[in-house]
Amino acid sequence: MAHPGLPGVMFQPTVLVLAAGQGERFRAAGGHTDKLQSLLTTARGTRTVLEHVVAAVQASGLPWHVVTAQETRHHAVQGMGTSIATGVAATRHAPGWLILPADLPLVRPESLRAVAQALAQHVTVAPTVQGQRGHPVGLQALCRDELLALRGDQGARVVLQRHAPHLLALEDVGCVLDVDTPDLLAQAQRLAGPFAP
C-alpha cells in the first residue's frame, strides 16, 4: 500500500522499502528469526528492524511503499530486482524513487530528505558515508522503464551504470549499516546507544 507524502511539496519521490527478501545470510550466520523481525532498542523504544525503518521513512514526510514477499510471490524469479520492479509498478506515477532495503534500521529521516532533495536536480543519486556507497539510492522517473525491467537479484546497479549517480556525502552510518548477520545487528545495537534492556 502506498502512503502519501507532505502536501504542498513539489518534488516528492516515493521511498520503496524493500522487505521481500528471505534473510538467508542472517540465518546462515546463526540468526534464529527473520532479520526484519529482529528487535533493536533505540531512544525511540524497542521495535523490529522493519518497524525502525518504517518509522524513519514516516518521519521523513515522503510518500512510501513497502514491498513485501506477498507482493512479489507471483514472480518466477525473486530478488532485489524483482522487488524494485514490483514497487515501481505499484507507484508508477511517482516522480522518482528512493530504493531503501528494509535492513537499515539506523537510517535517519533527514538522510532520506537529503537524497530526495538532491534527486530533484539529478537523474540518479547515491549517498556516501566516509567514501562508502549506501542507501537509499534515488532514481528519477526517467528511469521508470529500466526499473520495471529489473528481475532477480540484479538490483538497480545496472541502471546506475547507465545513469552515473550524483554522489551525496552524508554523515549517517545508518545509510551503510545493514543487519545482514547477527554480528551486524549487534553492531547496530551498540551504535544505537545504551538503550538495550
Regions found by a protein language model. Name each.
Residues A2-V15, R151-P197:
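Conserved alpha/beta core of the MobA/IspD/sugar-nucleotide pyrophosphorylase nucleotidyltransferase superfamily
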Residues G21, D103, T181:
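Active-site glycine-centered loops adjacent to acidic/histidine catalytic or metal-binding residues
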Residues G31-K35, L40-R44, T48, H74-T82, ...:
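Residues at secondary-structure transition points
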